[in-house]
């Protein structure tokens, strides 16, 4: 007994056997004494004195209590001290025991000296230790914090079976060491006194006596002082052995802090002393120990008694346990990490010591001894299963023994025992279960460590944190984790079988435990989460059985052990866990985590032990209600613990003990039904199983589940009540739930049950306190919640269960309370009944149920719990059999080496053009072979299927189909009908889900409808919104629908209301009246002539009439100020809806910009709320509400127009746009007359698309079809219907292209084609190309047209569409060329274009073009001017660009007309652009050089631009430069000259193709602004060239130098030497021929000049003259603005032939050039330019460059075209480009520029046509001259001499 006595002294279970009466009136006394002692010792007494006094007090109050306290102290001392320290601890404990009980005299005899020494040694610490023990349930439990002998006895029985005394000592020391540090920390922190006091007040029932705490403190202090390192066995062993897990203070009051927990711990021990059977639960509840019930029988405190005891206990057990447990766990972890293990005892020694101690304690209670033996046998056989069986056999005894000892003492002892060695102090049955888990491990310390480590760490952490939590972990953890894991795969059968046997006898015991189990079961989830692997096992409920068994073993030698059998229903779950609870090691791992994150341990404690403790300690009402019946049913359920573990969870869960199919009979669901708390006690593990491991139990309980619903309804209701309250607890234990979702979630509810029911009265506050205290204990992780749980369910069991369920539970840890809800899910239950379903259910049911139906869950709470146990049934997961993988026949061609194994086949889906979807799924053909059971699969390609996207995703079309594209007025009716249908749809559909995301979705929805209505009105009135009474009335009805009825009345007498108001007007007159002094002051000021002073005097006296009259004569600023003051003081202060009127007055006063301030003050826009102290309405309402007055303001302004009101509307629109009111802002912009439509990249743009916010939303908003079509309707109204000759929204073409692409993607190809044709027509019709008409747009149109053309099958609904397709296929560029070039050139260009048509590629059309024609286009590509030499190859290149070919081919024609298009396309292509450059460069060289000369890009940039089309963003700028350059060209001849030089070189290529005329044309082109029309126009430089060429005779010389310059420039501009060479060569050739032709032309002209008559004959003589003559006529006809000036050729050669103008121009006469500019009508001009394909082509090229430059500016645009971004970029780049280009083309080029973009290709086409006869162009240009002359006549060439 020496050692055993010592063990008994420090171990609650052992001490109870030492003779301390388990019945403990002592608990109350101890509580009081501990309180007193705490207060005194902490404040006044020295540690030794405190210990002694407390011991005395305890002994005086009750021998059992005194013994309990002594035992606790002694226990704490040995545990914490090293092998050396145990002596002191034993002495102290013996002293205390002697003082307390004669029954412990032997131990006391040894103890007194040691106790004195210890107290002396730790003079200040004893009391602290006592406090620490109280605060740290683990220590108390481990060291016998419970003074009750009964509890000690229970522990000895259990301990005898499981750990040897040596092991026990080792464990004690470990935990003591940890506890010492923890206690010391507690003491140091100053919690000792408070904790002792609190413990004495609230929790002495659990811990028995503050003296124990003192002893513990002394011991720990000594340990601190000792130099020798403290040996700490692994946390698991130490917790199991020491019983740290048994410390279940948290159960009593989760709220109370660690100090409170200490006092609760003391109370717990007192309760154990009072009654082993019921005392445990009573102690848990912290009820006053039943001093009068010393008998060991099962008699337990009534629920009211338990609740009463809980009143005191709830505070400390939880909180103290939390903080202390955390500290203690930390100490244990630190000690373990430091390997500071001073214990001399080996694992075997520890086991021996435990057994000895247990045996010592057992002597007092033979039942406990028997139970211990039984536990050992059971553990040896099947751990939890046997334990459950034995418990089932002895549940009554255990219960009886519990009653025998004071409830407080016995129960305390049980808890202490559980917490120290067994893991769950919550219920005696559970402690036994833990010992059972423990017992199998007793054989070796390693075994103990496996089970205990999981538990011990928890116990160490939880014990200190919440002694209850660790105990649950050790016992259930080891065995359950192992048993469950092992059995999970094997199946629940063995566990179920054992539980069946065990369950029946255990039913009575289970009754309490089921109650505890439910709360307890919930806690396990957290731990399970900490140990995710166990969860699968945990579901099996194996974990619960150990917990129940552990509790009985520890708590009550007999009765508790019998109750433990009741927990065996949890042992069912535990059978797996304990029997196979190998996870105990895992648990060990988890316990540390739990100890670190107390929440997990608390959850576990709740699961396994919390039910009983809660019943008695935390939730007295629940315990009382649940204990009797639930013990039996759950005992039965737990009896089959291993197999029935699932059932146990269900039963424990609440109403369905039945889930354990093995225990249908044992299931007496009535007990579980009615008292979930008892099921917690008996089946604490099952409830945990239910929550954490419930899935696994579900599999076993599948059959039972059907029954559970019946039982579940009562339990469910109870659980609802208890669980919901625990919502707080569950939340507090959220970490626990996090540890294991399912179990935790369930546990929180059981805890809540216990808390709500048993704690409802006493702990109800504690529950809330627990919630609040939880933060305090949060350090312990969720101990506040878990503490209540631990007491009810063995923490180890809970931990084990949690670990088992961890995988299932951990995922949704946050759902801990919902876990209960998830448990509530009945449907899950049915599913979880089958293992396989359980496997799946856990994951799904737990999270989904908890989340999906928490409300409904409440009703089926218990069923859900049972379902949860089932859900976690990872066993079922094991049951699931994965489908057998197919065995494929690998190929032999090397594909088998593919790491992706694509040879096995995979589905292929491809989305194609026009909304087509191609799919191919592989076919798996089985191949059977002899000797093969299964066939091998041969994968072969499947059928290729083509679907239409509309088949899968049908397009939602309105009743009325959009009539677009809107080309003419005939579409008006259809458009109005479509708009009306859309408006009706918006009104009927309501707000879309996407729109609802906006904070003001309803307002924006109304504003959207208003915007559409206004556009419809605009269409109805042909683009007019004002100036007509009818229009104004229509708009007024739209904006103010409410005025429709009042308007007629107003018409007849609008003033009538005003007259009716006249009577009130008298009041205003009265208010306006003032005293004579005010008037006198104003009069005096006026007499002096100080009108301004008079004004402000009137304002100060509120004489507004006087003030305004006088101010009207002063400066307007004074008038504005007076009105502003009037508005502020009179208008806005009168009514709440005066913002709009105030704004109108401000507008009248001229304060346009400030008018919006009346709607939303600047302070509000800045984010401030200004409050007026004077008494305005400002503070009474939201300042931003003024935005809602925008409609009133707009109506007032429109009805009362003023000179500058449009500015006010613009400001209003900006204000609305800044607040995201896009539709309202756009309405204001439309009426402001200053709305800026443009691309998204233009910062000045107000509207890109109506109804689309391009400033605050992503650009993909610009792809909205509704916005595009609405904007198209607006454009249609203001252009077509209004009679505007041109489109007002050039940027909209890009969006129309996007819409066309969208139509094509949806399979509506015919409509898409119509849009393409419309875009092409718009581009052709545009006289002033816009920067938005960049190459990206052109390329996109050409590409889409080519795609549509290629899909001939669906090209159109009828053959009619095909012709249009052919035209498109002929090429967009061909059309442009034909349109721009004019019919003269059209013939040639079309010919070439048709030839190009023959070729499908874009370059196919270039095929016909000779390099010369190409060169002009190239010249347009100034950058490529170097390739001019390549111009000949250029034609090749144009073809060479076949890469871009299909689209570019058409563009090549355009290139012919304008190489710029080519470049644009290439740019759109990007890389092809570069290629095209190569081909085009030859043709472009001149142009490029010219272009270089052209300021457009700074020629090099232009070249670079083309090379870098991606610079779309820059394009606008470059184009701007280009455009400006064209303008500058005329302005800046030199730059133009540079470009002209380029042109000249360009002309030489033209000469090659056309001969001299080309040169002249090129020269002429510059001369005439028409030439500028194309690149020439763009490069007004042509004028400079014209200047160079000015002397027609000298033209050769001039041109030659020009060519040289050009070549040089080309070289300089074009870095490519090859290009320079080519350009130089081409220029040289061209120059030579030009010189010759110019000379001839000069001679002809001279002759013509000399002949006053027409020189047609002369012209005929020389092809030049004839050609020019025709041109002259043409020019005369075309150039009406200014005819060419006749010049005497005899004089200086002031004339030069302007190729663009196709006439001779007098240098000296600027009008001639200007006239030529004015001469060309856009088309004609283009035609002449085309006729001078070279010259015009260069302009086109230059334009192309401009376009290119723009495309570069919109370089991003090309992609954006393909993608949504394109439109913005397209739109964006153009603005600047458009400006520049328009400028360049503005002179004569306006039309040509468009042509330049498109017509230039025609010019190349002409050149191409000529190109077909390159020889003619070069060698025999005369013939060409004829043609070109004709063209020139038509186009621009005027024979100056002819006139």
From Swiss-Prot:
* Composition bias type Pro residues, residue spans: 521-549, 594-614, 657-687, 1765-1776, 1790-1804
Gene that produces this protein: sec16
Reported function: Involved in the initiation of assembly of the COPII coat required for the formation of transport vesicles from the endoplasmic reticulum (ER) and the selection of cargo molecules. Also involved in autophagy.
Q: Chief localization class?
A: endoplasmic reticulum
Q: What is this protein called?
A: COPII coat assembly protein sec16
Please name the source species. Answer: Aspergillus oryzae (strain ATCC 42149 / RIB 40)
Localization recorded for this chain is: Endoplasmic reticulum membrane
Give the UniProt keywords, A-Z.
Autophagy, Endoplasmic reticulum, ER-Golgi transport, Membrane, Protein transport, Transport
Biased composition, class Basic and acidic residues, residue ranges: 165-177, 362-372, 479-492, 1631-1655
Chain intervals with Low complexity compositional bias: 309-323, 644-656, 760-769, 826-842, 1457-1468, 1726-1742, 1751-1764
* Domain of life per record: Eukaryota
Residue segments, region Disordered: 1-220, 269-324, 339-769, 807-872, 1385-1691, 1706-1843
**Where are the compositionally biased (Polar residues) regions?**
29-40, 58-76, 92-108, 183-198, 396-448, 579-589, 615-627, 691-702, 749-759, 863-872, 1408-1418, 1441-1453, 1480-1491
- GO CC, any one term: endoplasmic reticulum exit site
Give GO terms for biological process.
autophagy; Golgi organization; intracellular transport; protein localization to endoplasmic reticulum exit site; protein transport; vesicle-mediated transport
């Amino acid at each position: 007994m020496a050692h055993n006595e010592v063990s008994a002294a420090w171990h609650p279970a052992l001490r109870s056997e030492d003779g301390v009466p388990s019945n403990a009136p002592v608990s109350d006394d101890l509580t009081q004494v501990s309180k007193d002692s705490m207060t005194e010792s902490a404040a006044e007494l020295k540690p030794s004195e405190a210990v002694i006094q407390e011991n005395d007090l305890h002994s005086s109050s009750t021998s059992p209590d005194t013994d309990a306290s002594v035992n606790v102290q002694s226990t704490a001392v040995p545990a914490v001290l090293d092998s050396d320290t145990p002596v002191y601890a034993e002495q102290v404990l013996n002293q205390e025991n002697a003082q307390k009980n004669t029954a412990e005299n032997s131990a006391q005899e040894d103890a007194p000296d040691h106790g004195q020494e210890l107290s002396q040694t730790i003079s200040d610490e004893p009391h602290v230790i006592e406090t620490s023990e109280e605060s740290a349930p683990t220590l108390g439990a481990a060291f016998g914090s419970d003074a009750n002998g009964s509890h000690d006895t229970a522990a000895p029985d259990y301990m005898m079976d499981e750990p040897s005394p040596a092991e026990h000592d080792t464990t004690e020391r470990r935990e003591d060491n940890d506890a010492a540090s923890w206690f010391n920390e507690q003491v140091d922190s100053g919690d000792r006194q408070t904790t002792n006091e609190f413990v004495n007040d609230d929790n002495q029932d659990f811990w028995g006596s503050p003296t124990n705490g003192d002893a513990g403190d002394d011991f720990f202090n000594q340990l601190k002082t000792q130099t020798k390192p403290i040996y700490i066995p692994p946390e698991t062993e130490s917790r199991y052995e020491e019983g740290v897990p048994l410390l279940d203070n948290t159960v009593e009051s989760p709220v109370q802090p660690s100090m409170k927990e200490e006092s609760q711990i003391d109370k717990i021990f007192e309760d154990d002393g009072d009654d082993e059977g019921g005392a445990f639960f009573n102690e848990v509840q912290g009820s006053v120990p039943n001093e009068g019930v010393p008998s060991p029988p099962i008699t337990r405190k009534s629920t009211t008694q338990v609740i009463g005891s809980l009143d005191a206990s709830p505070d400390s057990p939880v909180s103290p346990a939390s903080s202390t447990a955390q500290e203690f766990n930390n100490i244990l972890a630190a000690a373990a990490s430091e390997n500071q293990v001073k214990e001399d005892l080996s694992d075997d020694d520890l086991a021996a010591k435990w057994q000895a101690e247990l045996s010592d304690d057992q002597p007092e209670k033979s039942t406990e001894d028997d139970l211990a033996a039984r536990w050992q046998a059971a553990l040896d056989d099947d751990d939890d299963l046997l334990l459950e069986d034995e418990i089932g056999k002895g549940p009554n005894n255990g219960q009886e023994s519990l009653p025998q000892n004071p409830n407080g003492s016995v129960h305390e002892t049980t808890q202490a025992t559980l917490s120290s060695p067994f893991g769950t102090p919550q219920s005696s049955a559970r402690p036994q279960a833990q010992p059972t888990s423990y017992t199998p491990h007793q054989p070796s310390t390693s075994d103990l460590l496996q089970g205990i480590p999981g538990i011990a760490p928890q116990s160490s952490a939880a014990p200190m944190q919440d002694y209850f939590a660790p105990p649950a972990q050790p016992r259930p953890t080891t065995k359950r984790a192992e048993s469950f894991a092992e059995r999970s795969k094997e199946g629940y059968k063995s566990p179920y079988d054992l539980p069946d046997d065990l369950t029946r006898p255990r039913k009575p015991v289970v009754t309490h435990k089921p109650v505890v189990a439910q709360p307890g079961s919930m806690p396990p989830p957290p731990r399970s989460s900490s140990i995710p692997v166990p969860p699968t096992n945990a579901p099996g409920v194996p974990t619960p059985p150990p917990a129940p068994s552990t509790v009985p073993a520890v708590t009550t030698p007999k009765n508790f052990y019998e109750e433990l059998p009741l927990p065996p229903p949890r042992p069912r779950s535990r059978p797996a866990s304990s029997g196979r609870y190998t996870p105990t090691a895992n648990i060990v791992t988890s316990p540390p985590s739990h100890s670190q994150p107390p929440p997990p341990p608390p959850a576990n404690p709740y699961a396994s032990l919390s039910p009983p403790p809660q019943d008695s300690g935390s939730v007295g009402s629940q315990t009382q209600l649940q204990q009797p019946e639930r013990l039996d049913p759950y005992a039965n359920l737990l009896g089959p613990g291993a197999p029935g573990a699932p059932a146990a969870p269900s039963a424990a869960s609440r109403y369905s003990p039945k889930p354990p199919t093995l225990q249908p009979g044992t299931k007496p669901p009535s007990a579980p039904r009615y008292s979930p708390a008892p099921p917690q006690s008996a089946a604490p593990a099952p409830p945990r199983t239910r929550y954490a491991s419930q899935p696994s139990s579900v599999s076993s309980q599948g059959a039972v589940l059907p029954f559970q619903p019946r039982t579940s309804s009562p339990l469910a209701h109870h659980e609802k009540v208890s669980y919901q309250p625990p919502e707080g607890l569950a939340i507090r234990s959220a970490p626990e739930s996090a540890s294991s979702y399912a179990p935790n979630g369930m546990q929180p509810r059981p805890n809540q049950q216990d808390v709500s029911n048993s704690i409802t009265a006493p702990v109800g506050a504690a529950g809330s306190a627990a919630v609040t205290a939880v933060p305090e204990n949060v350090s312990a992780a969720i101990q506040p919640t878990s503490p209540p749980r631990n007491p009810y369910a063995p923490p180890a069991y809970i931990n084990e269960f949690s670990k088992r369920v961890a995988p299932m539970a951990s995922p949704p840890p946050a759902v801990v309370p919902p876990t209960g809800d998830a448990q509530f899910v009945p449907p899950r239950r049915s599913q979880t009944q089958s293992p396989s379903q359980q496997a799946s259910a856990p994951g799904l049911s737990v999270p989904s149920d908890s989340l999906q139906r928490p409300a409904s869950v409440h009703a089926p709470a218990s069923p859900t719990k049972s379902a949860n146990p089932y859900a976690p049934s990872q066993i079922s997961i094991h049951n699931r059999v994965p489908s057998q993988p197919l065995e494929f026949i690998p190929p032999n061609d090397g594909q088998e080496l593919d790491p992706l194994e694509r040879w096995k086949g995979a589905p292929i889906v491809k989305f194609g053009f026009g909304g087509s979807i191609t799919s191919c799924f592989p076919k798996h053909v089985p191949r059977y072979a002899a000797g093969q059971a299964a066939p091998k699969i041969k994968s072969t390609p499947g059928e290729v299927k083509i679907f239409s996207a509309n088949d899968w995703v049908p397009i939602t079309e309105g009743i009325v189909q959009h009539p677009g594209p809107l080309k003419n007025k005939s579409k008006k009716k259809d458009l109005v009908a479509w708009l009306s249908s859309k408006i009706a749809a918006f009104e009927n559909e309501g707000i879309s889900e996407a729109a609802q995301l906006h904070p003001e979705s309803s307002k924006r929805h109304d504003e959207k409808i208003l915007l559409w209505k206004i556009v419809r009105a605009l269409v109805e009135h042909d683009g007019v919104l004002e100036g007509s009474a009818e229009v104004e009335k229509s708009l007024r009805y739209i904006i103010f629908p409410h005025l429709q009825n009042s308007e007629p009345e107003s018409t007849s007498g609008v003033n009538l209301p005003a007259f009716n108001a006249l009577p009130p007007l008298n009041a205003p007159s009265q208010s306006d009246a003032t005293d004579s002094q005010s008037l006198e002051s104003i009069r005096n000021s006026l007499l002096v002539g100080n009108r301004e002073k008079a004004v402000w005097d009137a304002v100060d006296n509120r004489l507004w009439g006087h003030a305004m009259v006088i101010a009207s004569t002063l400066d307007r600023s004074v008038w504005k100020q007076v009105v502003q003051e009037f508005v502020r003081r009179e208008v806005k202060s009168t009514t709440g809806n005066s913002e709009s009127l105030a704004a109108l007055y401000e507008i009248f006063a001229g304060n346009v910009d400030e008018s919006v301030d009346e709607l939303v003050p600047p302070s509000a826009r800045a984010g401030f709320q200004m409050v007026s102290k004077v008494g305005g309405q400002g503070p009474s309402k939201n300042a931003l509400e003024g935005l809602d007055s925008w409609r009133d303001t707009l109506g007032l302004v429109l009805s009362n127009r003023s000179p500058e009101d449009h500015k006010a509307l613009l400001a209003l629109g900006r204000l609305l746009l800044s607040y995201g009111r896009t539709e309202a802002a756009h309405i204001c912009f439309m009426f402001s007359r200053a709305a800026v439509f443009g691309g998204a990249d233009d910062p000045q743009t107000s509207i890109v698309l109506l109804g689309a916010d391009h400033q605050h939303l992503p650009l993909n908003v610009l792809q909205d079809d509704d916005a595009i079509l609405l904007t198209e309707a607006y454009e249609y109204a203001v252009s077509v219907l209004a009679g505007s000759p041109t489109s007002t929204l050039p940027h909209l073409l890009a969006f129309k292209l996007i819409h066309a692409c969208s139509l094509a993607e949806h399979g509506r190809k015919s409509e898409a084609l119509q849009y393409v044709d419309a875009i092409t027509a718009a581009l052709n019709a545009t006289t002033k190309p816009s920067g938005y008409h960049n190459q990206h747009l052109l390329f996109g149109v050409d590409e889409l047209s080519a795609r549509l053309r290629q899909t001939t099958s669906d090209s159109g609904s009828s053959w009619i569409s095909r012709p249009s397709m052919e035209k498109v296929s002929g090429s967009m560029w061909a059309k442009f060329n034909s349109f721009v070039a004019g019919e003269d050139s059209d013939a040639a260009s079309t010919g070439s274009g048709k030839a190009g048509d023959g070729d499908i590629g874009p370059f196919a059309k270039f095929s016909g073009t000779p390099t010369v024609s190409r060169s002009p286009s190239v010249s347009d590509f100034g950058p490529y001017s170097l390739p001019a030499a390549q111009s000949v190859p250029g034609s090749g290149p144009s073809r060479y660009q076949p890469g871009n070919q299909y689209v570019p081919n058409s563009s090549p024609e355009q290139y012919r007309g304008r190489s710029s298009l080519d470049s644009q396309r290439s740019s759109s292509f990007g890389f092809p652009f570069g290629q095209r450059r190569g081909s085009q460069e030859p043709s472009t060289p001149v142009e490029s050089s010219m272009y270089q000369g052209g300021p457009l890009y700074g020629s090099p940039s232009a070249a670079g631009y083309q090379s870098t089309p991606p610079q779309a963003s820059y394009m606008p700028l470059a184009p701007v430069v280009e455009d400006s350059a064209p303008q500058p060209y005329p302005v800046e001849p030199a730059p133009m000259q540079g470009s002209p030089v380029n042109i000249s070189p360009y002309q030489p290529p033209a000469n090659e193709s056309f001969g001299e005329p080309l040169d002249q044309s090129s020269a002429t082109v510059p001369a005439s602004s028409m030439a500028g029309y194309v690149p020439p126009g763009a490069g007004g430089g042509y004028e400079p060239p014209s200047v160079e060429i000015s002397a027609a005779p000298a033209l050769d010389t001039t041109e030659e130098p020009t060519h040289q310059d050009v070549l040089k420039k080309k070289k300089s501009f074009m870095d490519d030497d090859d290009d320079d060479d080519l350009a130089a060569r081409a220029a040289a050739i061209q120059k030579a021929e030009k010189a010759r032709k110019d000379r001839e032309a000069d001679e002809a002209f001279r002759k013509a000049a000399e002949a006053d008559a027409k020189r047609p004959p002369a012209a005929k003589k020389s092809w030049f003259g004839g050609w020019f003559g025709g041109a002259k006529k043409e020019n005369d006809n075309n150039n009406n603005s200014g005819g060419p000036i006749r010049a005497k050729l005899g004089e200086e050669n002031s004339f030069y032939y302007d190729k663009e103008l196709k006439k001779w121009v007098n240098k000296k006469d600027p009008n001639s050039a200007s006239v030529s500019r004015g001469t060309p009508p856009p088309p004609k001009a283009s035609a002449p330019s085309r006729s001078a394909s070279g010259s015009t082509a260069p302009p086109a090229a230059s334009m192309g460059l401009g376009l290119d430059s723009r495309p570069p500016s919109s370089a991003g645009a090309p992609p954006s075209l393909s993608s949504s971004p394109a439109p913005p970029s397209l739109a964006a780049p153009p603005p600047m480009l458009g400006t520049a280009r328009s400028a360049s083309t503005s002179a004569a080029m306006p039309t040509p520029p468009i042509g330049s973009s498109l017509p230039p290709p025609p010019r190349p086409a002409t050149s191409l046509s000529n190109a077909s006869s390159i020889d003619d162009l070069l060698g025999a240009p005369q013939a060409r001259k004829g043609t070109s002359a004709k063209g020139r006549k038509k186009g621009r060439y005027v024979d100056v001499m002819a006139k």
